[in-house]
Amino acid sequence: MKKKIFVFMFLMLLVIGVSSSYAYLKAEKGSTGNNNLSVGSLDVTLLTDISNINLNNEIPKEDSEGLKNPSTSFRIKNNAGMTASYKISLVDGTKKSTVSNKDVKYRLIRTNANTNETVTMDIKNLDSTGLIDTGTIEANVIYNYQLVIWLDINSNPNGLVFSKNILVEGMQVSSLDKSGANYPELTDNMIPVYYDKASDTEGVWRVADRKNLNETYKWFDYNDFMWANAVTVKENGTTSRSDYLKADLGTEVKMEDITTMWVWIPRYKYQIFNGNNELSNEQEIKITFEHGIDKTGTVSCKENILTANDSSSSETCTDTINGSIINNKSTYTHPAFTFGDEELTGIWYAKFEMSTDQDSVCATSQSYDNCDKEDLNVYVKPDHISLRYQKLMNEFKSIRNMELFNNIHGFIQNENATTSSQTGEITNDDNNIDIHMQKNMEWGAVTYLAYSKYGKYGNSLYTGTNKRVYKNNWYQQLSSVYNYKTGYSGYSYNAAPSTTNVVLYNDLTDLGSGNGYKGAGASTTGTVYGIYDMNGGAYEYVMGNMVNSSGAFYSHNAGFTASPLAKYYDKYSYYSTKSLAQASVSRGRFGDATKETTKGYVESTGSWEGSYRIFPYYGFSWSTRGGRASISSYSGINDLISLNGYSTIFNSSRPVLAVSREFPWLSE
């Protein structure tokens, strides 16, 4: 039997000093008992006095019992004439807690008092940051909160004390983007950029206004197909990294200095359009950007991995609001924004397929001996020979190694974090970010956004089949060497392989007649701000793995001798033979752009865009996406084939960057 312990809950606002007009909010205790928060023209008020709340004689409890604990109610109001971003955290005050955050569970309910919209958040263990809510609040809006806290049934904090303050922090938010997309979360080494067109075929990237308030240096506008872009640079190029990071707005960031280019995919929910494992045709996918880390979709799914020879599903999904999953009514918070146990406000997706140093022996003399390694530097840039000839495990580790100490990109890391393992773990990792090989679900998140009103499918420059992402058809065979280059366009979705009938990603020649831009038509937006190489280029391995007949991780020829942590791959049920039947296709999962975007139970034209649809099966346990340039047709961003994980001349991949739930506070 658990012993009772005394837990003292002291919740109040922590006073934070103001250092600039975009600094943290300052909390002041008023004579009426109210707590006012203000900074410059930003004024958010806590309307409830919660300076003394006690939770006495608390014992560890099951969730069902913990939810019966008394709730703490509080309200915040945005009195400013502009939208504000905020985060609410439980933090140590004068009296430091001795109970670990992970031993404390909570449930938060937020109601918009102006619209009566209520969001009941998932029950969670308090994370190391203490963050319980983050997002935006419109001018003159009131949010009502109910917070319930209890001790995890598996904890044993005998005789310890849990004492926390409520910390509310805020800042003015972008006024140039009206889509509702979450603000991009930049790491310390990332530079926000916009494209400055000099001519139809030339232009440069320049430092954007990270506050997104200055039209001249606008960073992003999802309503206008301008997804947020950011780059990392060399420590010492034509300009040093430190100088770039403090450079004036509009400063050119030279391509020769760039090491990686990223595009922000904000958290969203989408309307289910094919929830019954049926066939579907290309259509707009209706997307709503979500607030902070809200999970407002009506559908929830749980993994259900089967091992029978003819398994027909990989998950069980329900809609408790509508009673059942209903096409064009049920909604689903895209699962790509759940990373392990953590909810994300968005992800940074590599703008191009990965490459390596173009002067390296791997790039100049491609072979399995020269490239099938785990210690190659990964770049993400256009007009590069893509990195191939690696077995999947070496792709996985090369990408994880991008955040090791002293990496070429400037990602901050502990000086003792010098090695990674096949599980994906990095020794002494404490940098609050995670760079990992793309997962099947993350590919799906980009694909669905491309098919939304915010992507190329919604871009009026393109009509008919031109709404499909154009193919990167750059392909060259020199004897036994096969070359694929990043960031090219064949200015049609099914362009034949070539090195001449191609243009670079930033060719903005308008072809007219609904054909749109010659080069940018190969991006997910139909503009220079989207993601490239998702149709054609090299095949791209994704971390989507079919289990073996025992239900275990199935490396096959990928090179793994240990299973990666669960957060690093998407798992699918077993199937013994290659099959185009509905049962095999039904092993896809909501959001991964497989079963929902199947238009026929045929191999070569089974998915949207008329591209391949071959699900993993025994001997071919890994998923590969996007087709390749060397195939004359049958490519597309919904393309799926299965391979065994071995190194090939055709396969590349790309990284994804997840930033832990730290809010992007901006300095002056």
Pin down the residues of each PLM region.
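C-terminal, structured domain-capping segment
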Residues: 66-92, 132-183
